UniProtKB/Swiss-Prot annotation:
GO terms for biological process: protein insertion into membrane; protein transport. Residues 38-51 have a biased composition (Basic and acidic residues). Required for the insertion and/or proper folding and/or complex formation of integral membrane proteins into the membrane. Involved in integration of membrane proteins that insert both dependently and independently of the Sec translocase complex, as well as at least some lipoproteins. Aids folding of multispanning membrane proteins. It is a multi-pass membrane protein. It holds the Pfam family YidC_periplas. It comes from Mesorhizobium japonicum (strain LMG 29417 / CECT 9101 / MAFF 303099) (Mesorhizobium loti (strain MAFF 303099)). It comes from the Bacteria. The chain crosses the membrane at residues 7-27, 352-372, 378-398, 452-472, 497-517, 540-560. Residues 52-74 have a biased composition (Low complexity). PANTHER family: CYTOCHROME C OXIDASE ASSEMBLY PROTEIN COX18, MITOCHONDRIAL, OXA1. This is Membrane protein insertase YidC. It is found in: Cell inner membrane. GO terms for molecular function: membrane insertase activity.
Length: 603
């Protein structure tokens, strides 16, 4: 049938483009990025320049007004382990239901943070995700808040300031931690860290001026990272520097783009947030509300290469004998949809929901996630939720599909007339097309009706792919049996007898059980209709399920399961509708024809 062929060909081309892009661009780029990351890490580890001497008892010397201190480029990189790097400085412990780590008293940095609920792999003994690491490590990654002063203010808190703990030495949701520092100009800085049960820290800085004259100083915050993800990001989502500030709104700078541009500085703002984001994790700063600040995104090449998102407030004036307080919120954790949305609403963080990259088609992707997540709460399994979502989508669009398949059935009835027209005007394509249109008009057939299943299938397919790819809720979400991660490809393979033969196979040969099921269901669905008379189209229909089986093998298992289940439902739906319309279902005849001996050309 003409329209059904168009249906499959359109779907095939759409998925083929995505698969070819993933196989020939994403995978090689990922491998190249992993190798580049390995080389860079080796280079960093070999780089052992002497650290600049620093007096641990003093604050950071006052830099020029309006500048933000950034991590020294030539500092020492330790080849020791993480534990040794942490032991090199005094610390305050962090212990919450979601986080564990410590605050470095040198600089009052958040540079040691692990996520309790997330591990590197699905293995039970897999280590927890290390989100933040000390600067001395090749994977240095931290958040820091400080001040910029002048000669009048004296030394103000910065990267090298050693703070004193006042009271409680452990930060938890119920026990804030207070740090203090006093300089020789009569300025006392009191910093209070508090944290909720999830991933949000609140840093409250009070500056008490005990001197005899007013002072002005600036508050800054920065998220600095020395490495970048080993696996390259794709156009499916953004990884790198990010922020939403002022009237310019969302700013996204991939690692490669900021390496080229070196620095980007949007206009001043009085609200918003900025930081660095990965696929599943992020570290962001939310400056004091209504306090004007200058955001910046930068890449530094002096010494160790590093990426930085930072802000610098306007001058904060503190009269003699008075005090001033500024507050900065720091998000450091997993990009869980519900928590991100709650922070945006409860804390009035403007468009904080954009920390999750829903893409241009967010109006489809977000409802798709909401539906899957809602069903998960009832079913307790994301795989079952995906299957239930497919049923609901099919049911919602059943009336439209009914009309579409009814039109296809009518097209089958006029198939003989269409063949006559093709034979009659075989050498005149223009007249053939005109005759076809006249036939459609006479028989009251809409040849475009068969496109509706395609129009519905493609956005659902891509939105589900996006949900599986970007949302942390799908990460390590099990289905049943061997599928322990719906966001990863099916780990089995036909070519090693599904694990019975202990051999490591290349990516292109990892044809698992679910891709095979998907291929079989696609084959059956295509055989529901007559074999195309055109030899080229017939060959496409014959080989398309095989090609798709190989292509889909590298996609997330959740997407392949959806595709196979959708094929099954489509077979059932098409069979019911065609039977109602009195159209012949060609499935059994086509299957029997596969086993019949084909006549030789001489016969």
């Amino acid at each position: 049938m003409e329209n059904n062929r168009n249906f499959f060909i359109t779907i095939a081309l759409s998925v083929l483009i995505l698969a070819v892009w993933q196989y020939f661009y994403v995978l090689p780029r990922s491998e190249a990025q992993r190798e580049a990351a390995r080389v860079e890490q080796q280079r960093v580890e070999e780089q052992k320049k002497a650290a600049e001497a620093a007096n641990p008892g003093a604050g950071t010397p006052a830099p020029a007004p309006g500048t933000i201190p950034n991590a020294p480029g030539g500092d020492t990189v330790t080849v020791a382990g993480r534990d040794q790097a942490l032991a090199a400085s005094k610390r305050v412990k962090i212990d919450t239901p979601s986080l564990e780590g410590s605050i470095n008293l040198t600089g009052a940095r958040l540079d040691d943070l692990k996520l309790k609920h997330y591990t590197e792999t699905v293995d039970k003994n897999s280590p927890e995700i290390e989100l933040l690491n000390p600067q001395a490590l090749p994977t240095g990654y931290f958040a820091e808040i400080g001040f910029v002063g002048n000669d009048k203010t004296g030394a103000v808190p910065g990267a090298e300031t050693v703070w004193n703990v006042d009271g409680n030495p452990t930060l938890s949701p119920s026990t804030p931690v207070t740090l203090t520092y006093t300089n020789d100009k009569g300025l006392t800085f009191k910093r209070t860290f508090s944290v909720d049960a999830n991933y949000m820290f609140t840093v409250s800085d009070t500056v008490q001026n005990s001197g005899s004259s007013a002072v002005s100083l600036f508050n800054y915050g920065r998220v600095t990272r020395y490495d970048k993800p080993a696996v390259a990001s794709t156009y499916v989502l953004h990884e790198g520097l990010i922020g939403f500030t002022g009237t310019e709104g969302l700013q996204e700078h991939k690692y490669a783009s900021i390496e080229k541009d070196k620095q980007y500085q949007p206009g001043k703002a009085t609200d918003g947030w900025l930081g660095i984001t990965d696929k599943y994790w992020a570290v962001t700063l939310v400056p004091t509300e209504k306090q004007p600040f200058q955001p910046r995104y930068a890449f530094f090449e002096d010494g160790r290469h590093r990426y930085q998102s930072d802000f610098l407030t306007d001058a904060i004036n503190v009269e003699a004998g008075q005090s001033a307080t500024v507050e900065t919120e720091v998000f450091a954790g997993a990009k869980e949809v519900a928590k991100i949305n709650a922070y945006a609403e409860d804390r009035h963080i403007k468009r904080f929901d954009l920390l999750i990259d829903w893409g241009w088609f967010h109006f489809i992707t977000k409802p798709m996630f909401w539906l899957i997540d809602t069903l998960y709460k009832f079913l307790g399994n994301f795989g079952l939720a995906i299957l239930a979502t497919t049923v609901i989508v099919k049911a919602l669009f059943f009336p439209l599909a009914n009309k579409s398949y009814a039109s296809m059935a009518n097209m089958k009835k006029v198939q003989p007339k269409m063949l006559e027209i093709r034979e009659k005007y075989a050498d005149d394509k223009m007249k053939q097309q005109q005759a076809m249109m006249e036939l459609y008009k006479t028989e009251k057939i809409n040849p475009l009706a068969g496109c509706w299943p395609v129009a519905l299938q493609i956005p659902v397919f891509f939105s589900l792919y996006k949900v599986l790819y970007i949302t942390i809720e799908m990460r390590h979400a099990p289905f049943f049996g061997w599928i322990q991660d719906l966001a990863a490809p099916d780990p089995t393979s036909l070519f090693n007898l599904f694990g019975l033969i202990p051999v490591t196979l290349p990516h292109m040969l990892m044809i698992g059980v679910w891709p095979l099921i998907m291929g079989v269901t696609m084959f059956l669905q295509m055989r529901m209709n007559p074999t195309p008379p055109d030899p080229t189209q017939a060959a496409i229909f014959t080989w398309m399920p095989v090609i798709f089986t190989f292509m889909m093998a590298g996609f997330p298992a959740g997407l392949v399961i959806y595709w196979a289940w959708n094929n099954m439902l489509s077979i059932l739906q098409q069979g019911v509708i065609m039977k109602r319309q009195g159209a012949k279902i060609e499935l059994w005849d086509n299957l029997m024809a596969l086993f019949k001996k084909k006549p030789s050309p001489a016969e």
